[in-house]
Every structure is written in C-alpha cells, then in structure tokens.
Design a protein with these regions (language model features):
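Domain-level signature for soluble enzymes in the chorismate/prephenate branch of the shikimate pathway
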Residues: 1-106
Length: 106
C-alpha cells in the first residue's frame, strides 16, 4: 500500500471512531438521566479507573498503556461534561441571534 491508501484507511477508521464515540455519548446521556433520577454523582473515579483498566487489559498494542490512559481520560472528561449538561441543564439557553443580526434588524 502507498501513502494515499494508508490515508484512506485512516480516514475510514476515523469515521468509525466518530460513530463509536457518538454511540458512547448516547449511552452516557442515558446514564446521566438515570443519575439525575437517582441522585448519583456525575464523577465516579472508581468507575473511571475501571474503564481505563478494562481498556488497557483488552489492548493488543501498539499503543502503550500510558497513551491509552491519556486518550480515555480525555474521552471521559468530554463524556462527563455531556452528563453534567444532561443532569444540570443550562438555565438560560443561548439565543442563536448574533450581535450582527440585531444590527441588521435596526
């Protein structure tokens, strides 16, 4: 395979990763709803350690455990933010109108 073939493969893998991350986010939203209804905390460090351990144990390389840990810490940070917004909705939804839109209407 040449470099363009490898790049096509990476593009395909990136699309699959994005789909899986969105699927994970949907599951996180459902868990966030359950947490809200049962008054469970958003941040559960034991569960996050368990997730990282599971990923590291299932990995067959070439990523080092440290690298996987960093990747998953970031993923879980983003997912925690999604849960936070699910459990504690924004009290003042942002308007889609911009300052420029307001000036154009004047």
């Amino acid at each position: 395979m040449d470099i363009s073939d490898w790049r096509k493969k990476i593009d395909d893998l990136d699309r699959k990763l994005a789909a899986l991350l969105n699927e994970r986010a949907s599951a996180v939203i459902e868990i966030g709803r359950l947490k809200r209804n049962t008054n469970l905390p958003i941040y559960e460090p034991d569960r996050e350690r368990e997730v990282i351990s599971n990923v590291q144990q299932s990995s067959q390389g070439p990523l080092a455990e440290r690298d996987l840990s960093q990747i998953y810490e970031r993923i879980m940070d983003v997912m925690r933010s999604i849960q936070k917004h699910e459990i504690v909705p924004d009290p003042a939804p942002r308007s889609r109108e911009t300052e420029l839109d307001s000036q154009l209407e004047d």
